[in-house]
């Protein structure tokens, strides 16, 4: 065994120019968020494990496979944060930030997250994340559009020309209708699904749409579309958001199969992809 210590698998040392570039990127994004009236927030690198199970979802890959759980001598189980949102919501509630007269809350953050997944090119067990949370008891369309604009302007400030992918997940009624349709569709095909998706069929069938197994992907292509199960109220709300984005000249595409592996996504989901770098 070598006497020379090396960095843990799936981590990296940021040296010199790379560290400077990282700091510059964070500074640029912080500046854009500040221009939109957002404030910084810092939260612990670890939280009670049950926070992530409740906030992120028991059936998600993050909770089932990817959390770094900490050995400790106390009565509580702790995990390194696999993402920021659950911890930020905990901080908002614990510190009663929801009682602020200045709503919606606009918060930005950056730092390490930790996911125990297979390291590969461009994927680490300790990636770094920058993000924003715009939070209110009742988020209106203009606030949601503004949050998307922060992302768009931030990427443009970094020299990236993004296009936004959007999907309307609807409200409770729409998702309940769609969940039943997915169960009806996938149940006869259960034996053809991977082991994980067989569990997802029982816990959260929407997560099957995010499966990366090629054989499951073929089944997903023929699955019912969520847009066919949206009630009129959800359709009108989404249409209003698209009007706001159009008025701001935001480039976007609609993706009926776009879902994400976190259970706290409601109503709308969006990701950005570069059209050029």
Residue ranges and their predicted role:
Residues 1-273:
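TRNA-recognition modules of translation machinery and tRNA-sensing kinases, especially anticodon-binding
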